């Protein structure tokens, strides 16, 4: 686990690399990251030492690839800065998000689409899960995100998400 309040992005990533390295020595593995967790996994995969086996597949659940518009809007809010720390600032930074980079691991993005609409829509009509938009979790280095009609927080607990992951892993085995 990690605490965005007390740890910066690089410190969390540095702690994650040996964990993934140990996992890789046990054989074939996959990684699943939700939201910031997916950003941390991408950074950690890119920081793995040479010769360490990469994951067979990376699943990103509502994990921003592009800077988060909510993080950008909240970046000057004292409470947001206190709670999210350096990681919250990273999520709103074009330069820092680009610096995380893409991974060469086969990647599947899964995005929620049950966010607010109308007057309370912070995403200007873009499909979203209430925290990130479909555009923010999209990239040209993997297929379009698979859409699931749920909110950001519930995405990891979604039966539909589990089915998608299991189906993709079965397809990978063929």
What are these model-derived regions, one by one?
Residues 102-174:
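C-terminal catalytic-base region of ester-bond hydrolases, centering on the histidine
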Residues 1-5:
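A short beta-strand-loop structural module common to alpha/beta enzyme folds
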Residues 6-104, 124:
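Serine-dependent carboxylesterase/thioesterase catalytic core
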